[in-house]
Design a protein with these regions (language model features):
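Nucleotide-sugar donor-binding and catalytic loop/hinge architecture
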Residues: 1-3, 157-170, 194-199
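Conserved donor-binding/catalytic core segment of Leloir-type glycosyltransferases
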Residues: 5-7, 163-181, 187-190, 204-205
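A conserved mid-protein helix/loop that constitutes part of the nucleotide-sugar donor-binding site
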Residues: 14-22, 178-195
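Glycosyltransferase donor-sugar binding loop
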Residues: 34-39, 174, 202-218, 234
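Conserved active-site histidine-acidic residue motif and adjacent donor-binding/catalytic loop
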Residues: 56-60, 231-245
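Short His-centered aromatic/hydrophobic patch
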Residues: 78-87, 104-105
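A conserved, positively charged/aromatic
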Residues: 93-94, 100-104, 108-129, 136-137
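Donor nucleotide-sugar binding/catalytic pocket of nucleotide-sugar-dependent glycosyltransferases
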Residues: 121-157
Length: 245
């Protein structure tokens, strides 16, 4: 097995960290994980299976990783979000025989300005077909959609007919309410549902922090309170997915 170091730029325990932690809880392999101090580090340490290393300086971290790659300690590096792409691209240039992987999560990471030059030894992955398409359209770079372990639908024919049995349809939207996480599309969809009344009543349940300091976010929350045909409920960040259900 190739020795892949894992980098988590955030030490918090939000969506991408929860997905990564679920993987770490189910994999049969052991990994070295570099992560800032925080909840995520504590969870990995308490799990007692993998080896977490704290870092406080991004530049020092990548100098250390360069040395580890040079010494042959790692065969590659996986980064759990796109914020460190420029550092990873530098390592990819210095070590063309090593493999590098980036999990693209946000729209802001799909731009040509962020991804820059494509390297043959860098692979971009996502768990969203929407993000995958954005990367391809904006940069021409191939991005691969990885279907997560919870979905058995990969390779299985989809449902041919979809019927709604209840008068109320509840839609859960998980993630921080902000402009980089699809606020524009959410707002337009809510407006469409409000202006095109259907036989069923729609409830939108938002689970995640709200960036009220951003004017577009604040305006949407205010407008959501004026809807008559749909109902929007903001629950804030939840610590456990069981709370959602």
């Amino acid at each position: 097995m190739k020795r892949i170091a894992i980098i988590s730029p955030s030490g918090k325990f939000y969506g991408s960290e929860q997905v990564l932690f679920d993987f770490l809880c189910t994999t049969q392999h052991k990994y070295v994980i570099y992560v800032p101090e925080g909840t995520f580090y504590d969870k990995i340490k308490n799990q007692g299976v993998h080896t977490p290393h704290l870092f406080t300086s991004v530049k020092k971290l990548y100098l250390h990783l360069a040395w580890m790659l040079l010494c042959g300690e790692f065969d590659g590096i996986y980064i759990n979000e796109g914020g460190h792409i420029k550092y990873l691209n530098l390592l990819a240039s210095l070590f063309p025989n090593k493999n590098f992987y980036v999990h693209i999560r946000l729209l802001e990471d799909c731009s040509a300005a962020r991804l820059r030059k494509m390297h043959k030894n860098v692979s971009y992955i996502s768990i969203s077909d929407y993000i995958t398409t954005e990367v391809k359209q904006n940069t021409g770079i191939q991005c691969y959609t990885m279907y997560d372990i919870y979905k058995l639908s990969s390779g299985i024919a989809g449902i041919k007919e979809f019927r709604i049995e209840n008068d109320i349809v509840r839609l859960g939207i998980v993630g921080r309410l902000t402009t980089t996480k699809g606020l524009y599309d959410i707002s337009h969809f809510c407006n469409y549902c409000e202006n095109n009344q259907t036989k069923v009543h729609l409830e939108f349940h938002f689970f995640g922090g709200i960036d009220n300091h951003i004017s577009e976010v604040k305006d949407f929350v205010v407008k959501a309170g004026t809807y008559k045909n749909i109902n929007c409920k903001f629950h804030g960040f939840v610590n456990d997915k069981k709370q959602i259900y």
